[in-house]
Design a protein with these regions (language model features):
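Catalytic toxin/effector domains delivered as secreted proteins or via bacterial secretion systems
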Residues: 60-89, 93-116, 125
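Active-site or metal-binding loop neighborhoods of secreted/extracellular toxin and effector enzymes
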Residues: 97-187
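Generic hydrophobic, helix-prone segments enriched in Leu/Val/Ile
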Residues: 7-10, 14, 40, 75, ...
């Protein structure tokens, strides 16, 4: 699909019962974020994955050891190449959040996960052992890029770039609001 058609379909997806069921299965706390994510898509950032940012504490169900799970808010997806530079610039100038263009590389290039940006961590026990649960690379293998492009239903002929936004502070809400505010200024 052309970018605007894919954008309209992405916006409509947020209203579908199947999509909401999938969100509930994956992370029910994201339900309250759907309206703002829909607006972000409407303003030209077709999202393929996101997390709002949270902190939770508890005790492990088997070991009884205390743990703390911390998430960074993040958002990733496609934007028209013509809009991306101003968006990234404004995110860097007008917010305390991060936005980067993610280049596509050959599937043959090794991307060590130890060099990725941590997105979700768990601290367990005393002394605290920190485990990285989810992370994102600063480059995308071509096959992953194409998989995301297919998920967004974008034609290969569309001049789009992959954008990754994240909050450096663990557990903080507000990334989505800042992204939407900057999109309204930039796109």
């Amino acid at each position: 699909m052309k970018f605007n058609e894919a954008k309209a379909q992405a916006v409509a997806l947020f209203n579908s019962a199947e999509f909401k069921e999938r969100v509930i299965e994956e992370d029910a706390s994201m339900l309250r974020q759907l309206a703002i994510l829909q607006e972000i898509n409407k303003h030209g950032f077709i999202t393929v994955n996101s997390q709002a940012g949270a902190k939770t504490k508890g005790k492990h169900y088997e070991t009884g050891k205390p743990y703390e799970n911390m998430e960074r808010a993040y958002l990733m997806g496609f934007m028209l190449e013509t809009d991306a530079a101003l968006f990234i610039k404004n995110m860097g100038i007008k917010t305390d959040k991060n936005a980067v263009f993610v280049p596509v590389c050959s599937d043959d290039i090794k991307l060590p996960s130890a060099l990725d940006i941590p997105l979700t961590i768990t601290k367990i026990g005393f002394p605290k052992e920190t485990r990285i649960d989810t992370h994102f690379s600063s480059a995308l293998p071509k096959s992953t890029f194409e998989s995301f492009r297919k998920q967004a239903k974008l034609n290969k002929s569309e001049k789009v770039v992959f954008i990754f936004c994240w909050d450096s502070e663990w557990g903080r809400q507000g990334l989505f609001k800042d992204v939407l505010r900057v999109l309204k200024l930039s796109v």
